C-alpha cells in the first residue's frame, strides 16, 4: 500500500479549489485549479482554511503543499480575474494573500512545498512562504516575471526572495523577469532538493516519505516547530532579542516529554521514540 493510500479521506474545501487529506502525521494540501492551478481570492480562502485545519490538528506534524497534475505547481494569480476586479478589490486580494502566506509561515509546524511542475509568479511566492522546497528534476521552470506585466511580485516575492538569495540577486531576477529551471533554482538556494522521481505519483510518494522523517517517532515535532519559530521570528529582530526568544523556546522544550525521552535515550544508548508532546 502506498503512503498516499494511508492518508485519510480526501476532503474538498468549500470553493472546490483546494483538497485536503491527512494521516501518519502529515497533511497533504493540493491546489486544484487545472490546467495551471492559477489562484484567485476563492482559492486563497480555501488555502487559508486548509492551513488552519492543519494548524489546529494535533495529529498533523508536517504540512505538504502540492499542485494538481504534472504540469504546474501554480502559475500564480489568474490574470483574467485581476483584469475584471476593481483597484480596491485588487488591494484587498493582495492583502488577504499576504495574510494567508504569513499564516503558513507562522504555523509552528514544518511546511514542505512539492514543486512537480512550473512554479512562476504568485506560485513561486506561495512556495517561498514554505519552509522547504523540493522540486521534481526537469519538470518545469520557476521565476517572478511580473515586471513583464508592468507590476511587481505583490504576494511577498520582493521580501521573501531577497531574504533567500540576497538583495542584488533578487533584484536581478525580478527586474529581468526571467524564468529558469529547477536545477538553477537549486544552485540559487530557492530549491532545497531535487527529486529524481519519474512520475507525478512517484514524486508525491517521495514527498510523503520525506515528510515522515520529520514526524514522531522519528523526530521531535515540537522541537522542529520551535526551531522554525526561532529562525523565522529571530531573523526579523536584533540578535539579542533573537537570543532571548531562543532561550524562552528552549525552556519550553526542556519541559516536554520528548526532551525527557531524547535525553533518556541518549544516556541509554538507544534510538529515541518521540511522541510529539
Mark where each language-model region is.
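CoA-thioester-processing core
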Residues: 100, 104, 114, 120-174, ...
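A general structural signal for well-ordered alpha-helical segments in protein cores
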Residues: 44, 158, 167, 204, ...
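Glycine- (often His-adjacent) and acidic-residue-rich active-site loop
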Residues: 46, 67-100, 119
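C-terminal long alpha-helix characteristic of the crotonase
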Residues: 53, 135-140, 182, 191-244, ...
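Acidic, divalent-metal-coordinating active-site segment for phosphoryl/phosphodiester hydrolysis
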Residues: 121, 177-184
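Conserved CoA-thioester-binding segment of acyl-CoA-metabolizing enzymes
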Residues: 1-66, 102
Amino acid at each position: 500500500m502506498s503512503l498516499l493510500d494511508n492518508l485519510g479521506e480526501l476532503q474538498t474545501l468549500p470553493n472546490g479549489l483546494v483538497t485536503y487529506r491527512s494521516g501518519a502525521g502529515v497533511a497533504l494540501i493540493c491546489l486544484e485549479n487545472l490546467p495551471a492551478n492559477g489562484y484567485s481570492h476563492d482559492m486563497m480562502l480555501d488555502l487559508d482554511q486548509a492551513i488552519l485545519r492543519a494548524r489546529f490538528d494535533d495529529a498533523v506534524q508536517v504540512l505538504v503543499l502540492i499542485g494538481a497534475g504534472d504540469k504546474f505547481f501554480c502559475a500564480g494569480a489568474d490574470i483574467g480575474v485581476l483584469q475584471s476586479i476593481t483597484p480596491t478589490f485588487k488591494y484587498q486580494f493582495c492583502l488577504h494573500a499576504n495574510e494567508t502566506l504569513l499564516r503558513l509561515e507562522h504555523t509552528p509546524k514544518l511546511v514542505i512545498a512539492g514543486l512537480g511542475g512550473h512554479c512562476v509568479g504568485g506560485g513561486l511566492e506561495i512556495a517561498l512562504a514554505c519552509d522547504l522546497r523540493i522540486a521534481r528534476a526537469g519538470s518545469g521552470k520557476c521565476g517572478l516575471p511580473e515586471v513583464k506585466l508592468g507590476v511587481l511580485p505583490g504576494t511577498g516575492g520582493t521580501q521573501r526572495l531577497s531574504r533567500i538569495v540576497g538583495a542584488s540577486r533578487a533584484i536581478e531576477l525580478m527586474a529581468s523577469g526571467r524564468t529558469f529551471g529547477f536545477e538553477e533554482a537549486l544552485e540559487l538556494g530557492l530549491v532545497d532538493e531535487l527529486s529524481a522521481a519519474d512520475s507525478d505519483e512517484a514524486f508525491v510518494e517521495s514527498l510523503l516519505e520525506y515528510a515522515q522523517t520529520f514526524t514522531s517517532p522519528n523526530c521531535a515535532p515540537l522541537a522542529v516547530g520551535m526551531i522554525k519559530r526561532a529562525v523565522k521570528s529571530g531573523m526579523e529582530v536584533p540578535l539579542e532579542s533573537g537570543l532571548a526568544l531562543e532561550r524562552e523556546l528552549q525552556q519550553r522544550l526542556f519541559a516536554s516529554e520528548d526532551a525527557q525521552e531524547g535525553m533518556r535515550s541518549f544516556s541509554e544508548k538507544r534510538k529515541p521514540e518521540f511522541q510529539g508532546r
